[in-house]
Amino acid sequence: MSETRAVLRGVRLSVDKGRLVADLIRGKKVDQALNILAFTQKKAAVIVKKVLESAIANAEHNDGADIDDLKVKTIFVEQGTTLKRFTARAKGRGNRISKPTCHIYVTVGN
């Protein structure tokens, strides 16, 4: 069977926080990975779980894959654009606030 991908771009999440969760499920079987993500208490876990479920649905619908045989082949989190915002400070000054985004790529296969 070929590999099937799912991509989520522009997620309002830091790359480092996303990679912490991605490292937990890399190389695992999909049912085990979903179980790990369900019990991981991080914002990134909810987002990565949605992308993984999308990749599983893509594999089942597009390739006719059996879910029991699938495992997470690759998962990586790359840096997206950074939203730059302004916050007011004392004496008429201002400081920049950086709001990072990331892109999440998940590939499942046998």
Swiss-Prot record:
One of its GO terms (cellular component) is cytosolic large ribosomal subunit. InterPro entries: Ribosomal_uL22, Ribosomal_uL22_bac/chlpt-type, Ribosomal_uL22_bac/org-type, Ribosomal_uL22_CS, Ribosomal_uL22_sf. GO terms for biological process: translation. GO terms for molecular function: rRNA binding; structural constituent of ribosome. It holds the Pfam family Ribosomal_L22. Keywords: Ribonucleoprotein, Ribosomal protein, RNA-binding, rRNA-binding. Signal peptide: none annotated. CDD domains: Ribosomal_L22. HAMAP family: Ribosomal_uL22_B. Belongs to the universal ribosomal protein uL22 family. Part of the 50S ribosomal subunit. This protein binds specifically to 23S rRNA; its binding is stimulated by other ribosomal proteins, e.g. L4, L17, and L20. It is important during the early stages of 50S assembly. It makes multiple contacts with different domains of the 23S rRNA in the assembled 50S subunit and ribosome. This is Large ribosomal subunit protein uL22. It comes from Acidovorax ebreus (strain TPSY).
